[in-house]
Each structure stands twice: as structure tokens, then as C-alpha cells.
Amino acid sequence: MDETIYPGIVSCLGLLIYYFTLYQSGMARGKFDVQAPSHEGPEAYQCYVRAHQNTLEHLVLFLPGLWLFAFAVDHIWAAGIGLLWPVGRLLYALGYYKAPEKRTIGLFISMPPIYIFVVGALIAFAMKVFEQL
């Protein structure tokens, strides 16, 4: 079986979580009567917008990190560790929608995979370079 299937599934889950926050941010416009293109509105509306924007900011690091780690280290490990990111981002968004201080647990779950992926891939690639010397 092609091992890229597993990080591929995790990538799709990450994109679905991003789309969920995008959708929720759009729905919040109607809920809080904020007309496009404005992002000004009540604090509750801002929580929806920030959950979406922050997820986008992290997605840019998560997806390439996931795939770099998958190719440099292991596809299965990448997928297993990577599952933490969509779960954490979902908890982050749902918490943020309730109150800003309730986003923390989701952030703490979703951040480590990014660090593990980037640092792990860098170490693995460096080791491969040194093996060739």
C-alpha cells in the first residue's frame, strides 16, 4: 500500500478544519451583522475571525511540515503525529468561539506537531547529508 495515503488523509482533515473555521467566520458575519468587507465588530465576532485567521497562519506551517517529515522520516509517524493538529485546531476554534481564554488547550495540542515536523525533518535531512560524506 502506498504510505502517502496516510499523510494525505491527515492533510485533507487539516484542510477540512480550515474550511470549518472559514465557514464559521462567514456565518458569524450574519450572526453579528458585520457587513463585508469590514472585519470590525463585537468581540464575539472577532473571536470567530481570529480563529479562522490563526488557523490559516498555522496551516501554512503544518502542511509543508507534515510532508517534509513524511518524506524525511516516516509517513506513518507523520500521519500519527499530524492527527493532533486538526484535533487541536478544532478544540482551539470551538474554545475561541466561547471565549478567548478557552482557546489555550487547542493551541497547546496543535503547536507541537509543527515543531516536531520542522525540526525532525531538518535533522533527518541533515543526517542524510552527513551519511553521503
PLM segments and residue spans:
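Alpha-helical transmembrane segments of multipass membrane proteins
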Residues: 65-68, 90-94, 125
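Cytosolic, membrane-interface loops and tails of multi-pass inner-membrane proteins
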Residues: 23-50
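Membrane-embedded alpha-helical transmembrane segments of multi-pass integral membrane proteins
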Residues: 14-17, 21, 84-92, 113-123
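Core segments of transmembrane alpha-helices
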Residues: 54-66
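Juxtamembrane boundary at the C-terminal end of a transmembrane helix
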Residues: 122-133
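Interfacial loop-to-transmembrane junctions
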Residues: 91-116
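Short alpha-helical packing/oligomerization segments
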Residues: 66-87
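N-terminal signal-anchor transmembrane alpha helix
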Residues: 2-33
